[in-house]
């Protein structure tokens, strides 16, 4: 019985804290005029502008807020999907095949520490200012995270599981697809989640 009461109290306090912040914000900006509306518009003004832009209000470029959101999602998902499609198989291949790891990992380790934002000048030089340069920057962020976690997940596969599979006559590909990848899925999905950030 104590848990539901505590839960309700927590929800009430959460709502009250948000309402308090909004009230103080409105008080400071619109009622007492302590802060210029140019510096910090009131919550009512922000809400009115949001609704206006959402419902097709006139923007300088003629697009609605939903059109801007759709354009941003197209760029973000484009880079993310390509980064994951290349990064996950690369990480798995590097972790599973020693010869491929010796070839690819040094090259990957060169670009791995470079932050995604550092690629901006190169992307602009290579791809211009437009859709593809933005996708390229997001691609690198997603690619690095997906590759690292896929690699780590396969490397953490229990050797005992691989020995058991080998004892039962599993081929190299069967061990990869039936043992290593299922074991690595939590790490791979963590990489996919981090790649979204």
Predicted regions mapped to residue ranges:
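Generic hydrophobic transmembrane alpha-helix motif, especially the helices
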Residues: 109-145, 152-153
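Intracellular coupling helices
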Residues: 155-166, 173-178
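Transmembrane-helix boundary motif in ABC transporter permease subunits
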Residues: 78-108
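Hydrophobic alpha-helical transmembrane segments in multi-pass membrane proteins
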Residues: 71, 75-83, 117-121, 182, ...
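Periplasmic/extracellular loop-to-transmembrane helix junction in inner-membrane transport proteins
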Residues: 31-81
